[in-house]
Amino acid sequence: MLASLIGGIFGTKNERELKRMRKIVEQINALEPTISALSDADLSAKTPEFKQRYNNGESLDKLLPEAFAVCREAAKRVMGMRHYDVQLIGGITLHEGKIAEMRTGEGKTLMGTLACYLNALSGEGVHVITVNDYLAQRDAELNRPLFEFLGLSIGTIYSMQEPAEKAAAYLADITYGTNNEFGFDYLRDNMVFSLAEKKQRGLHYAIIDEVDSILIDEARTPLIISGQSEDSSHLYTAINTIPPKLRPQKEEKVADGGHFWIDEKQRSVEMTEIGYETVEQELIQMGLLAEGESLYSATNLNLVHHVSAAIRAHFLFQRDVHYIIHDGEVIIVDEHTGRTMPGRRWSEGLHQAVEAKEGLTIQPENQTLATTTFQNYFRLYKKLSGMTGTADTEAAEMKEIYGLDVVIIPTHRPMIRNDQNDLIYLNRNGKYNAIIQEIMNIRQQGVAPILIGTATIEASEILSSKLKQAGIHHEVLNAKQHEREADIIAQAGSPNAVTIATNMAGRGTDIILGGNWKAKLAKLENPTPEDEARLKAQWEQDHEDVLQAGGLHIIGSERHESRRIDNQLRGRAGRQGDPGVSRFYLSLEDDLMRIFAGDRVVAMMRAMGLKEDEAIEHKMVSRSIENAQRKVEARNFDIRKNLLKYDDVNNEQRKIIYSQRDEILAENTLQEYVEEMHREVMQAMIANFIPPESIHDQWDVEGLENALRIDLGIELPVQEWLEQDRRLDEEGLVERISDEVIARYRQRRAQMGDESAAMLERHFVLNSLDRHWKDHLAAMDYLRQGIHLRGYAQKNPEQEYKKEAFNLFVNMLGVIKTDVVTDLSRVHIPTPEELAEMEAQQQQQAEAMKLSFEHDDVDGLTGEVTASQEALNESATEQQTFPVPESRNAPCPCGSGLKYKQCHGKI
């Protein structure tokens, strides 16, 4: 109440921002007569003039009014469209690195051209990021004439693009592409073996379309490049027979003979004691577990992994809801957009378990080679902005995670859509029947088009079946009709059109009342002016008829977990001041109601004795549903924040490794770098045999001489030196041994020649760095999966993770240096032909690498993650990791019998 009172006196922050921006809009409008008087040539010549002024020190903020006026005039001449004042406000918002919330149909694509043009003047490149390839290609082609008129180049990136074409696209002033492609190109650029192979030229400025979908819905999505691991398809096939013999326990804490308990909120399963015993017996009968062995012994944890994946595949993942089968493959369905995601695979064995369940060919698992998340990738940009129709409900998260303010842009015309109260039914069948009846009522009253939003493919097909029974012609838009998507949406506003759509989020195409006459014209072969006039006249009549019938009617078949997704569905109606109606139909069996709405509401409704075809409409129920959505949103925000704390640790390490890699690629010679490695490795090696600040009697000189001979192939008379010079202490010995080793390395280097030596050094350093970074990622993943258990020991898991991750990282750097020094010391001097062959092999390895799109549905620190089958042609072996003991003198956990410092802790 106090906040609203203060807002009433001083105005809200959004109102103050709009007031400030309107003053800039006045400056732009004042320039319009002058700019309009310019010839086409003079208007185009403004771009090089702006670039020169920028290079002379004038800021983009100073150039903004004139640049926006030029862009608006060019759009009028080239595209026949003039930016409204509200679009100018949106353009200012984007330029200032904020999120512009603009209603559907208000012209976000045209608005984005303003910020693109202004920021492209710096010459550092602008990235326009969309949710799919279709929208990237469409928007690029739509805006190409405008930007080319203004003298700017435009490029588009997409998957499986030719390297030369992709490199050219990144060199363009403005580059369009998907969030996945930009993210994977970043990872791929950090796996190349020469700077010439890198595609991106820095992350300067990005405009993200549907920013809420990418930065919120997909925030937990890790981008992963992976290679094939060992084949264990026989295990998945065998263990797939177990879940059908099990049954779930209804409640977590109430034993009822069930074998496992399902946590639908976390999307996980936990086996009960009976479950353990039953599974163990099944595995013993299969010969996968020895008699008397425990399923949870260290040697059998792999079986636990397979059993858990199989149970989840059978009981948590449903066909036509979470995935579809197409051409003998399991294709994931994005829960946020309803789109299929070919090439993406769940990891942790889940995808293989689903393949086994469906009786399909089981593809090998993958091992992570490089990874980042959208949260961390997009925070690498110097300036980030976004546009969407729905971001205000997530404004707090946008600010806290990304530092992005949300500015709500006013509509060009007032919104007159009628948003009606929800109707709640006893069960799904009653709800579906009510929806069909409502459609029939609307059809009887006029020609209003109807859009029905569903949350799953299954629901869309149930409604489609009922509409067929009622004899109502309709179109279905879900993952299975992906190819016809744009055409279906283009005509969804036609008179009497009935369209069922699974999750309208991110569809990217406006629904025009009366249909889209231009789309119809484009389908005609050799259309004539008469065809155009006929279709346009027909549309004008249809448009008027639909307006008279009340505009587009939106029917939501259930509430989503996020209010934002519901708002996106509603936002399809009422564009640009058009009329429209929206209403949601719910049932007590809907997932949101069943899991989150609360037992009190459900019990109250059942107690009312409602019949299947009766609905209630009550503020308390609507409030309860909204509270449930708020709970889910808050829970998901907490999960994303928690994950980010852990991933920030990985991200800092990633930035160090990638920065180091770039330095290695940029240097002509690594001699100084490698010699420093020699000194550090010698110091660590000597410390293993001559402990710091120890007396001579504690020195293992013979062991040191053996290590130098075995590891480096160097015979050094260390004992003789000590006998000749009794004053030679530990520090002096380190210096003398290092000097000797480096002197011998320089001799070998001289024999090879500078060019060959530099090539060999780069080969060994990059190979070692990439190999151990890959193993480090596996170790970090292993650490993260178990770190929450530290909480039971009254330790802070986050702090423990940071400490352990630091130890792993330092250990990895030491192993990399040791590997490089050992390899360079022992390798025979290669011929020029052998060096050329090594370089070719590196290139082949890079080219063999395919990107795997990973879609993480993480609802905690562990969860299902997807990985693509497209991976390395060569299989990657799995690296076993061990915990770091408190003392380096403690026995190594691997069981070798050696001290940790002489085994897996060897630096």
UniProtKB/Swiss-Prot annotation:
So where does ATP get bound?
87, 105-109, 510
| Naturally occurring in which organism (per UniProt) | Acinetobacter baumannii (strain ATCC 17978 / DSM 105126 / CIP 53.77 / LMG 1025 / NCDC KC755 / 5377)
Task: Output the superkingdom of the source species.
Answer: Bacteria
Q: How is the cofactor bound?
A: May bind 1 zinc ion per subunit.
- Name of this protein: Protein translocase subunit SecA
Alphabetized UniProt keyword annotations: ATP-binding, Cell inner membrane, Cell membrane, Cytoplasm, Membrane, Metal-binding, Nucleotide-binding, Protein transport, Translocase, Translocation, Transport, Zinc
Q: Its function?
A: Part of the Sec protein translocase complex. Interacts with the SecYEG preprotein conducting channel. Has a central role in coupling the hydrolysis of ATP to the transfer of proteins into and across the cell membrane, serving both as a receptor for the preprotein-SecB complex and as an ATP-driven molecular motor driving the stepwise translocation of polypeptide chains across the membrane.
Q: Where does Zn(2+) bind?
A: 892, 894, 903-904
User: Catalysed reaction(s)?
Assistant: ATP + H2O + cellular proteinSide 1 = ADP + phosphate + cellular proteinSide 2
List cofactor names only. Answer: Zn(2+)
Which Pfam family would be a valid example here? SecA_SW
Protein location: Cell inner membrane; Cytoplasm
Can you name a GO cellular component term? cell envelope Sec protein transport complex
User: Which terms does the UniProt entry file under GO BP?
Assistant: intracellular protein transmembrane transport; protein import; protein targeting; protein transport by the Sec complex
Name the predominant localization: membrane
